[in-house]
Amino acid sequence: MEPITVNYKVLDARAKVPAYATPGSAAADLCAVLDEPLTLAPMERALVPTGLAIELPGAHSVALVYARSGLSIKHGLCMANGVGVVDSDYRGELKVPMVNLGREAYTIQPGERVAQLCIAPVYTAAFVPAEELGDTQRGEGGFGSTGK
């Protein structure tokens, strides 16, 4: 598949261009742009700047920001909002809302890879009111209703 073009603007000279770690990576790494190391105590949150703004190609794309698996598993450093959603019309700086869910403080170093950016297509929906919804085998079952 051909790569799509995502224009980016450097807002801070220390910013690193998002990069894919391997040819099979689904997301590109985002790096912290910090004046000094940032220590997050357990349960502390911070908005980590990247020094970059992006322009997504058209209204039917989105950038999703995810935690890096190694940081979350080894240190409890996660996205404070679960998944960051960057809308196609947003032109401000990409910032990563992070929370330390670990038991020990964690220090983010300037230039450290802190999150992953995944570009994906988006469907917009026309929401239509309905008196009845189609039947399915699952029906209204949710929250573990399909078993372990």
What is each residue range found by the language model?
Residues 1-148:
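DUTPase catalytic domain/fold
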